[in-house]
Amino acid sequence: MRLHVGCAMWTHAAWPVAAEPAASRLRAYAGWCDAVEGNTTFYATPSRSTVESWAGQTDPGFRFVVKLPKVITHERRLNGIDEDVRAFLHAIEPLGPRAHALWIQLPAAFAPGDVAALATFLRRLPRTYRYAVEVRHRAFFEEDRSISLLERALGTVEAEWVPFDTTVLFESRPTSDAERDAWTKKPRVPRRTRALTAHPIIRYLGRDDRETTIDGWQPWITTIAQWLREGRSPTVFIHTPDNAQALDLARLFHTHVRTAVPTLTPLPDPPPTEPLTLF
């Protein structure tokens, strides 16, 4: 029984992995967490050689949730993108089993009237991969008809709905520059806890205050524990506005779930941050 946890990136100036050479920071990160969001691919399709280096730094059981490029999802809105999709799939092929899911993050303007285009797009994708869809239009969280419409479209290809839980961020006014920036950029939508598949994916955003972040994820401990008991295999990504503590918090989240589900396989101990010496 495994719960995979990770962060929005594999390096940050405040993390121990930042002390490693740039070419080996992913390997160092994989000693702390066993999943990562592939956000860099949103901005451009990586070279195949770059992806080969990612695969070479991680075990086959490591999970990449790789975001489709914005030219596909945001600029062309899933239309006329065959060549872009083919290029992206070719580039990420070296990940093999590490490509846990391909993540289709859609803009806030993507509304219930666009679901038919999404359904067509999903049906045309190869079944080689799992797919995970993130939406931000409030109708998908507040209108039963819109929720059912999207769930049916995802269900036809066994795709997962990725909730981005930002409720803790918006519970009180921001207190740092990073929180103020997040207030202007992050979606403000209700929390969603329904899994559609055996491989749910959760994105949780806390605050820069550690205890507030921990208090805010308590409902997820209960939900994840129940999913594990049902035989599901979840992946959870922990965010904070500045992400300075996200690496440690991701491991702590795993520990809290393991307290609720003692049979959960523990994460390996992270590598030492300083060389071991006798004196």
PLM feature segments, named:
Residues M1-F279:
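Residues lining hydrophobic/aromatic ligand-binding pockets adjacent to catalytic sites
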